[in-house]
Amino acid sequence: MKISGTGSAHPSKIVTNDMLTQLFDTSDEWITTRTGIKERRVISSEYLVDLAVEAARKALDDAKMNAEDLDFIICSNVVNEYVTPAMSCMIQSAIGAKCPCMDLNGACVGFIYCLDIAEAYYKIGRVKNVLVVSAEEPSGMLNWHDRTCSVLFGDGAGAAVLTPGDNIKATRLSASPACDRLCERRELQYTPFNTKTDVNMPLVMHGQDVFKFATNAAIKDLSALLTTLNISANDIDTFLIHQANLRIIKSIQDYLEQPKEKFPVIIHKYGNTSSASLPMLLDELNREGKLKSGDMLALSAFGAGFVSGACILEW
């Protein structure tokens, strides 16, 4: 398949590092030095599904496609406002599509999971046109008095329309069990039979463990795909790395011995938007005219699980 259109949407509320100093002991310098983040967008009056729908419509417009022509909608999200129905079904209803829908939770790797599934369905002749949407609201998972996590995340949505083609050259998905290193326990409703007392807790993250895993996993995934395709990092025009932490991106860049210009970032203004970060970055590059036909792109992401994934595609 090939990506024929992109879109993104962001909440209107901007939360700067200076604003966070009113909530806990931190500073703009402390946050920027450790993460590269200056501000993030946080949902206030909006609903996440509205951002998802906006991103989807922009992607369809960019692809010059009607929603009725879609064969499949896949949506990645960690936290949906509704337990049911799936967010993909709500997107389908809003845009007027009539195709099957599916949600998945691949943590921050969700967008690459969606690309891989779309490509697999295309190869067996099940679909021609697929809408992929990643919509995330990490702000609702945080303890906003804990600076270790709340400085990192922002909300947003990104989307891509995939159409027939052979532009997705290779993908790789992997998992390494370490579920207690980055997790949030869901709040459950009372039942007369549930004897558990620890039914809810905010997001917990062991930062150093996550940093090591993310860096090593991205390097391993990207190196494996380059070997599979018998190409080198020099053949990649742009590396799109999950916008989790600027130091992680820099570590990957240093290992691959590639120039900074090949690693565009939006983390400084959006923070870590989980699985939405890659399609949001892709859309910004697309709309700014920074991607040329024939460019080779390498996407890499990593997240809770631990899970990781990478994809090399031609623009």
PLM regions and their residue ranges:
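Condensing-enzyme catalytic core mediating Claisen C-C bond formation in acyl metabolism
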Residues: 1-45, 146-212, 216, 220, ...
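Buried hydrophobic positions in well-ordered alpha/beta secondary-structure cores of metabolic enzymes
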Residues: 3-5, 31, 59, 70-73, ...
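Flexible, glycine-rich active-site loops centered on histidine and acidic residues
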Residues: 127-157
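A contiguous, well-structured pocket-lining segment that forms one wall/lid of small-molecule binding clefts
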Residues: 198-267
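Conserved catalytic cysteine-centered active-site region
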Residues: 32-34, 38-50, 77-130, 254-281
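Acidic, glycine-rich active-site loops and adjacent beta-strand->loop/helix elements
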Residues: 9, 76-82, 108-110, 134-139, ...
